[in-house]
Amino acid sequence: MPHILMIATGGTIACCETAHGLSPALDSAALLGALPELSALCTVETLDLMQLDSTDVTAADRQRMAQAVWQNREKFDGFVLTHGTDTLAYTAALLTHLLPHFDKPLVLTGSMLPMGVPDSDAPRNLLDAFRTAADGRAGVYAMMNGQILHGSHVFKQHSTKIDAFLSANAAPAGEIRESEVHWNTPASVPSGEPQLVEQIDTHILPVRLTPDLDPSFFSVLLGYPKVVLEAFGAGGVPARLESAVRDLIQSGTRVYITTQCPEGGVHLHKYEVGRRAEALGAISLGSRTFEDALGALMCGEL
């Protein structure tokens, strides 16, 4: 029987109502108490790593999560990590890059409603996450609403609906149907040895372009290590900003371009405005989600 480590970090799934609103309070034992059928699926140990609203989760916290997984990888067949949904996409993406070529299943999950409230999605999501981890396929995934999402393609598209997540720019990795794990593609062949990335760079500044953004704004960014421009559509940068972007690049700043669209990616070659941005030296982030691009940049992959 698979032996799984559950790492609890807080989030809505662990929330209780307080005088100041929902706040994480339930520990891993309380969450597991809602899953009597789990004992027939796998054996479980728990680690209560932190108790945070995911809004408060930092890069250092995500490094702690990666370290907890890495330090226990020889002892367990897989991992389930409970997490708040608001920044789950950021955590799934960064863990994908902090643990490249990971050779065990690491499945993140959470819920849009707290455990124990009527019609909560928490019991289903948590049980499905254990099903996915127990299945044994290596990699970093998120399990939400019956869908298994690759960690690098997770996108939260709605702030309240149960069906809040989509797999951006890629088909879901799989799904749970009739309590069984069904994968959409064959397991990938590892392309390297598992490792833990221990050094990250958080000096990355996203700038969301708007139609009337003042070009003078860019002067305060001169020399900043890395800037990600969230551009329009396929990657267009307005002509009136080109001089400011050129100065930014010439100052030594690496400028990357992503899109404000949740899906479709960047295609700088498609329009003249994109080709001009590329000629300035801006770097396309292609079909990466913003969260995945941020994780790759933090880990020095780009």
What annotation goes with each model-predicted range?
Residues 1-71, 240-243, 247, 263, ...:
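ATP/NTP phosphate-donor binding region
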Residues 2, 7-15, 28-38, 150-236:
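Accessory alpha-helical/coil subdomains and C-terminal extensions
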Residues 10-11, 80, 129, 146, ...:
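Buried hydrophobic positions in well-ordered alpha/beta secondary-structure cores of metabolic enzymes
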Residues 17-20, 92-93, 118-121, 151-156, ...:
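Short acidic, glycine/serine/threonine-rich loops at helix termini
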Residues 76-88, 223-234:
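Short acidic, glycine-rich surface-loop motifs adjacent to enzyme active sites
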Residues 81-104, 237-246:
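Short Gly/Thr/Asp-enriched flexible loops that form oxyanion-binding sites at enzyme active sites
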Residues 108-177:
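Internal gly/pro-rich beta-alpha loop/helix module
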Residues 235, 239-302:
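ATP/nucleoside-binding phosphotransfer catalytic cores, i.e., glycine-rich phosphate-binding loops
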